[in-house]
Amino acid sequence: MYNSSNIIDYVIDAWEKLQEQAPLVQCITNSVAANYAANVLLAAGASPAMIDNPFEARSFTEISGALSINVGTPTTEQIQAMQISAKTAHEHDIPWVLDPVGYGPILKWRSDMVDELLQYHPSVIRGNASEIGALAGSLVQSKGVDSTLKSDEMFQLAHNLLTKTSCVAISGETDYILSNAMTCIVKVRGGSHLQPKITATGCALGTLIAAYCAVAPVHLATIAAHIHFAIAGKLAYDQAQTIGSFNTMFMDYIHMMDANLIEQYACIELISDD
């Protein structure tokens, strides 16, 4: 049985393992996010590798601790690499995270490709409310790749996705995490309103989830990554209220995270999953 206290203990344990193991995370991500996501992983203690070449995908996925796939700016070659790596991860029980950026009727090509990737059962699907809602089959519209709906309007629909994945994370002002391994929904609060003003923060969160998945059970890894991000965002905003300075402090706190900060600042709520 989970409660707020023991979840925080599990998160601290996951963070400690992340520091000890520095897992190798293969990232097939978009051209806007690659540099930022790699730096977030390095700051958090993981080892990123941005291998998105279909000729190298299989061999590299086989040696990775986890895989992160983000469909933000897909190319034909990237899609081939995604399919190969997702299949390889599925065959070798390597955890992998799917970030269906922009999923919906407007961007049909990528959305069809995401539908194909679901056959390889991602360990985690992470997205904003509109992406998760669209993927779950609701009749929502997505404004580009930005969410037009609140997370709390979508989390019930996310249950539909738990037949395709072990865990669903809906990112927003408040984050919601649902999993087949829990009888509750975990709400994670924190962060800052400046985070959406910085490109690639959501994409980087997806890669951080993958890093934690390499060292902890999927549902706890997803919670840990969101708490890590939320605390870094809160503490960064306490120090800096302008975007440039906030971005620097945010990366600093991703790196400076420790057990004491997690215990002191993690803000979660468990709600009934009826």
From Swiss-Prot:
<keyword id="KW-0808">Transferase</keyword>
<keyword id="KW-0418">Kinase</keyword>
<dbReference type="GO" id="GO:0004417">
    <property type="term" value="F:hydroxyethylthiazole kinase activity"/>
</dbReference>
<dbReference type="InterPro" id="IPR000417">
    <property type="entry name" value="Hyethyz_kinase"/>
</dbReference>
<protein>
    <recommendedName>
        <fullName>Hydroxyethylthiazole kinase</fullName>
        <ecNumber>2.7.1.50</ecNumber>
    </recommendedName>
</protein>
<dbReference type="GO" id="GO:0005524">
    <property type="term" value="F:ATP binding"/>
</dbReference>
<dbReference type="GO" id="GO:0009228">
    <property type="term" value="P:thiamine biosynthetic process"/>
</dbReference>
<dbReference type="GO" id="GO:0000287">
    <property type="term" value="F:magnesium ion binding"/>
</dbReference>
<feature type="binding site">
    <location>
        <position position="200"/>
    </location>
    <ligand>
        <name>substrate</name>
    </ligand>
</feature>
<comment type="pathway">
    <text>Cofactor biosynthesis; thiamine diphosphate biosynthesis; 4-methyl-5-(2-phosphoethyl)-thiazole from 5-(2-hydroxyethyl)-4-methylthiazole: step 1/1.</text>
</comment>
<dbReference type="GO" id="GO:0009229">
    <property type="term" value="P:thiamine diphosphate biosynthetic process"/>
</dbReference>
<keyword id="KW-0067">ATP-binding</keyword>
<dbReference type="InterPro" id="IPR029056">
    <property type="entry name" value="Ribokinase-like"/>
</dbReference>
<feature type="binding site">
    <location>
        <position position="126"/>
    </location>
    <ligand>
        <name>ATP</name>
    </ligand>
</feature>
<keyword id="KW-0784">Thiamine biosynthesis</keyword>
<comment type="function">
    <text>Catalyzes the phosphorylation of the hydroxyl group of 4-methyl-5-beta-hydroxyethylthiazole (THZ).</text>
</comment>
<comment type="similarity">
    <text>Belongs to the Thz kinase family.</text>
</comment>
<keyword id="KW-0547">Nucleotide-binding</keyword>
<keyword id="KW-0460">Magnesium</keyword>
<feature type="binding site">
    <location>
        <position position="50"/>
    </location>
    <ligand>
        <name>substrate</name>
    </ligand>
</feature>
<keyword id="KW-0479">Metal-binding</keyword>
<dbReference type="Pfam" id="PF02110">
    <property type="entry name" value="HK"/>
</dbReference>
<feature type="binding site">
    <location>
        <position position="171"/>
    </location>
    <ligand>
        <name>ATP</name>
    </ligand>
</feature>
